[in-house]
Every structure is written in structure tokens, then in C-alpha cells.
């Protein structure tokens, strides 16, 4: 049975990376074999502008490589800090801006399908624009008010609704990291149990 892939995405500063680290530790303590795919946005080469469609293509390829390694490893669960769905979400946004075609976006989606990489469960963490800016300590050059508002409106508000994958959406504004962790741990274990049951049924057919 291939591993259960859980992808984290969401508003900047909503707690994605912190949640991934905490959940990985807890799941391993419970006996799960856990893989991790770190966010590739932090290592984009200088030749690709951060926040550009070309930069997103590079991140897509890097994420695909790491995911392909993990699904062929001995894992029960793979936690992904921004992966397939996040990449497709940005393609959707760049297409709306006229920077990327829907045809190219579909090619990217087909590529993931061709190599057998599929997100099984989405964890979308969100916070309001003002809270994101507060947690960052101010607006950045790329991650500014306009960027965050567009992300929450287009990706959290519109794109995710069209994605036919089991998901949870959690506003972390008034929650501590521990509260977020505890809630997500239960949601992930519940979804993983269903995944195992469905996989076992398919193998018996």
C-alpha cells in the first residue's frame, strides 16, 4: 500500500510549518512511519524570481522529486509542507493573472498523475490579512497586504472549493500551536484510517 499523503497549505504565517513539525513528532511517537517533504519555496534559486510562475515551476519539479522518493520509501504517512495542490493553486492564480495558461496547468496536474503522486488529505490553515502581517512583523517585499488578500480570496476562498479531495480548513487566529496540533492530529488519524480501509477493499477486489 502506498503512503497516505497529507498536504499543508494556507495563508502565510498561519502555522503550516510549525504544525508539520509538531505532527511529525507526535505521529512517530504513536508508531507511524512518517515521511516529510519540506517547503521548496525557501530554496528557490536566485535565477527564478520569488512569487513568479517560473519559480512555481521549479518548486513543482522539486516537490515532485521529493514526493516520488517518499512514496517509494517505507512510509505510512507523508507530510508535505506545500505540495501538489499548492502548486496547482498557484498555477490557477497565475492563469487568472495571464501569466500561465490553463493548458500548462493541466499538464502539470497530468504529470503528477503519471508518476503516481496524489494528495489524499488537505490541511488548509488560514488567518485574516491583518493577523498575517502582525505575525510577520510587517509587510514584506513579496508577501504584502495585496498578496495575502489575493491568496485568501482566490486560493482559500475560490480554488480549494473546486478541489475534490478530503480537506479541513482551520482558522488559527485565536488558537495556540498546541490547540491546532491536537485538532489536526485527530483529523489526520481519522482520515488515515479511512484511507487504509479503502485501500484494503481495493486490494481484495
Regions found by a protein language model. Give the residues of each.
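Conserved lysine of the Walker
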Residues: 16
